[in-house]
Amino acid sequence: MTKKIIMGVTDLSFHRTTASLVANVLKAMGFEVERIFSPHQENFEKLKTGQVDMLSSAWLPSSHGIYKAGVEEVEPLIELGLHYEPYALWGVPDYVPEAAVSEVFDLLKAEVVKKMNSTIQGINPGAGITRFSIQVMKDYGLSDAGYQFFPGSEDDCFSAFESAVANKEWVVVPLWKPQFLHYRYDIRELKEPKGLLGIVDRAVLLLRDDKKHLFSEQQIQKLDSLRFSNDIIADLDYKVCREGKPQDQVTHDWLIENGLI
């Protein structure tokens, strides 16, 4: 009888790509895999209530540590693998002169305020980058300088950036790595001396301890051995999001090429 695994996937493109890699590995082990896509906090809530057996991927400790702790109030979790090493950032297109804008403080310069798009378009409210960005806006006094930060959808964020770049506008984009925009565009990270954007996290698979029995020790070791990278995820995600290739096929082909299934 085929064993079934329900995987909670944070509903952003690179999380879907990473989850597709893991799902293909699970299928190769003989599992039937159902993926449920949810926003950040809802995904962790489903892990907590047992609606999903595992979650891909948790950014620990800074971005999602608070959500993981909430789950572990009711059920221990097992961390598996190192999918990539993500971090949050604020960036500008490389055509914005570094002499003018190299760090967040530079956004307060009068000459920069005149040229920079005042809208900073983010993603959904539960994302680490959104929480961090709201704090950056506050601590640097950017609202007082005329900037506005808006949470929104992933597409809102990417479209705003790509539209600005098409018009060679100066624009700030709250992003992270891995992200497929880095594959196509040269985005310069701004220094953020107050340390409000978190640290370099570990992106891992989380498995509820009460579901560990579904796996053999060898299968657990296989899941724990999975190592991708920011560049690998960004590359695969670009193929899906901008080249229109089928996600599960893209990740399946990559796993075969790299001898992982």
Question: What are these model-derived regions, one by one?
Answer:
Residues 21-29, 113-147, 253-260:
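Ligand-binding cleft/hinge of the Venus flytrap
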Residues 66-79, 168, 180-194:
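Ligand-binding "clamshell"
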Residues 88-98, 201-215:
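A bilobed periplasmic-binding-protein/Venus flytrap-type ligand-binding module shared by bacterial periplasmic
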Residues 1-14, 26, 31-36, 117-121, ...:
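Short, well-ordered beta-strand elements
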Residues 12-13, 31-46, 148-160:
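Short helix-initiation/N-cap motifs at beta->coil->alpha
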Residues 136-150, 155-166, 174, 179, ...:
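An extracytoplasmic/periplasmic, membrane-proximal ligand-sensing/linker region
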Residues 48-57, 117, 163-173:
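Alpha-to-beta junction loops
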Residues 76-124:
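A conserved helix-loop-strand patch within extracytoplasmic ligand-binding domains
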